[in-house]
């Protein structure tokens, strides 16, 4: 609980946050079970994160109709991005996603225009990796950008 309170305080200083759905629910104390969550709930969660001080929000990992969805939310924009879902658990995917977001911002790219590119890049690289039973990791040594 202390750690979550600390993260909530940090929201006042963040220009952008990239929580997965679980993290976003914890940060906002949203009162629905995971299985009850719909797109409109995620938009409410993003609005609440915005009211807590963050300018731009990317909520990752919302599964719907065998797609993996990301919500981009800012003051004037609510936009959904979809990607095919690969039926495998990969450790570190969210971290790589956030790093690629940061990279796009440093390059001066418009975030809204970069999200689909980032999702496609992750999908293509995860799809090419060897799959093992249990939890897998992103194999960065095999990660290809711009092939």
Residue spans for each PLM region:
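Conserved phosphate/ATP/ADP-binding segment of small-molecule kinases
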Residues: 1-78
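Short, charged, surface-exposed loops that flank catalytic or proteolytic processing sites
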Residues: 32-41, 106-116
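Charged C-terminal helix
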Residues: 112-147
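Glycine-rich beta-alpha junction loops
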Residues: 23, 61-65, 84-87, 119-122
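Short pre-catalytic strand/loop immediately N-terminal to key active-site residues, enriched for Gly-Thr
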Residues: 78-92
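Short, small-residue alpha-helix embedded
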Residues: 88-111, 115
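Hydrophobic residues in alpha-helical segments
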Residues: 28, 105-106, 126
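Residues on a specific face of well-ordered alpha-helices
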Residues: 5-8, 12, 47, 99, ...
């Amino acid at each position: 609980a202390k750690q979550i309170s600390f993260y909530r305080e940090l929201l006042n200083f963040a220009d952008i946050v990239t929580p997965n759905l679980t993290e976003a629910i914890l940060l906002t104390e949203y009162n629905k079970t995971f299985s009850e969550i719909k797109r409109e709930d995620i938009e409410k969660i993003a609005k609440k994160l915005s009211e807590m001080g963050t300018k731009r929000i990317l909520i990752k990992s919302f599964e719907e109709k065998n797609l993996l969805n990301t919500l981009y939310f800012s003051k004037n924009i609510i936009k959904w991005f979809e990607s095919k879902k690969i039926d495998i658990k990969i450790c570190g995917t969210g971290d790589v996603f956030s790093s690629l977001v940061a990279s796009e911002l440093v390059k001066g790219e418009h975030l809204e225009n970069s999200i689909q590119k980032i999702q496609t890049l992750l999908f293509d690289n995860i799809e090419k990796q060897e799959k093992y039973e249990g939890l897998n990791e992103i194999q960065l040594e095999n990660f290809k950008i711009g092939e």
